[in-house]
Each structure stands twice: as structure tokens, then as C-alpha cells.
Amino acid sequence: MNPKGICRLFVSVFIASCVLNLSSVPNAFGTDSLSVSGCSVSYVGYLRDLAWEYERRTGIKIYVRGGGTVGGLENLREGKSDFAATCRNRIEGDPEDVEFVQVAWDALVFIAHKSNPVKNISLEDARKIYFAEITNWRQLNGKNAPIKVFISRTTKSLSGIEASLRNMVLNGKSPVENPNLKFLPSGGIVEQIIEKSPDGFAASGFTSARKRDVNMLKLNGISPTRENIIKKKYPLKRPLFLVVPKNSGPEVKKFINFILSKEGQRFISALGVVSLLDIK
């Protein structure tokens, strides 16, 4: 896909997400509803389904929005949501007086277009892509085409994916900016762009990428499957959190207690997500 096509797709995805958000504006202070926003990996991977199940059981409506870790934490700070979802640990600048509660496991995965003949990548080659030392798919035994790299990033803080990428792959460093590196506002948009970009490459979370029409690359010959993550064969495992104010009301605490219960964790596991029960 050429740059103009990518831009048009981005605009379409952004407008569509805005329409969806406006169609379900939450009442963050209602007694019969809760609201959560944040990490796209959590939103796509388990949070929507969990919210529907919780409403079915309790009658409490949970309004769920994606938009990324940074946006979710900002909404929480500004009182626009009752809690937030994130796929990274706490960093400097995050809201104070909150708790990061781990609710599931995820793994950082590398994704490409379905048609891409490259099916495996080494951790070292992935690192070289982000440092602009590998710039063409031909260098990975693929076709002669530039590697178009997409990363979720905002101006306010580190996204969950980039934080994991820096900590687990890039030895604490930032990706090297170059003409083939594009920044997008959320991981959900990155995944949708990869679905449409034959030369695209990105890091994402297993929990959401498994539900997209993308090619999840093997890493050092190991497939990113739920079984391999549980058995600790696939590396780059990372936690998924819900971020809750320390002074949360009783309904928020009830929801957190449900998700941490054996029943809640079994429901998460049944969705195909790696639950806390799956990894001891």
C-alpha cells in the first residue's frame, strides 16, 4: 500500500473509532454502570467480552473503550472513566493513588501482512529492524520491498507496546526514526494497518493479534501460541493490568474481585487468553 493509501486508511479507521466511541458515551459516575478505557490489546482481546459477561451476571453495564494505554490513563486521571486497562507497568508520570492489578498474561509478538512469505524472525533481526539496520524484506529472505514499520506512540507518554518493545527487545533504547517508520495513536490502529499493508511490520500483543487477519511471526522458530506462552517456550511474556483508583467505589471493587476470582479467570481462559490460573 502506498503512503497516500495508508493515510486514507488511517483517517477512515480513526473516524470509525470516534463514531463508535460517541455511540457509547459512558456515565463514569452512575451507580448502575462503570466505564473503562485504555489498552487496545486488552480491549480487543478480552475486556469487551468480560464486560458483557459481567453485565449478564449482575445487570451492571460496563462501557468499554480502547484508544490505547496512554489515553486510558488520562481518562482515569481526569475522572472520565472508573478504571483503565494497560499492558505495561507503571512509569513516571502515570496517575498517582492508583493500583496496577494484574488480571492476565500476554506476550509481545511481531506481526506482518498475511501474504508476506516471511514466517519467522530472530530476536536479533527484530532488533535490527527497529534500529534501521535491516530495512528490506529481502534481508529476511522475503521479497524485495522496504519494511514499513508501524508503532503506537503518543506525545504524552509511552504506549504499552513501545514500553514492552524497549524493555524486552531494544535494550532500553528507542527505535531509530527513519522514513519507513510511522507512528500511530494506538495499537488497535497499528493492527488494522498491518491487515492492509503488504510490506508492513509491527509489534503487538498476542491477546489481540490472534483475533486479527495478520501473520504472527515465529520468534526464533517458536510459534506465538497460547500453549507455547503457558509452557514458557515462547519468550516475551508480559502482564496485562487494570488500573484502579485506591479510593474506588464498591462496584469497581466487585468487578475486580470477579475478574480475579477462579470463575472470572476461567472465563478469561475460555476466551483464549492466558489467565493467571494458566501460569503458576
Q: For the regions a protein language model found, what residue spans apply to each?
A:
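Short linear, low-complexity motifs centered on an aromatic residue
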Residues: G5, V25-P26
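N-terminal secretory signal peptides that target proteins for export/translocation
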Residues: M1-C7
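Bacterial N-terminal signal peptides
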Residues: L9-S23
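Exported/periplasmic ABC-transporter solute-binding proteins
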Residues: A28-K280
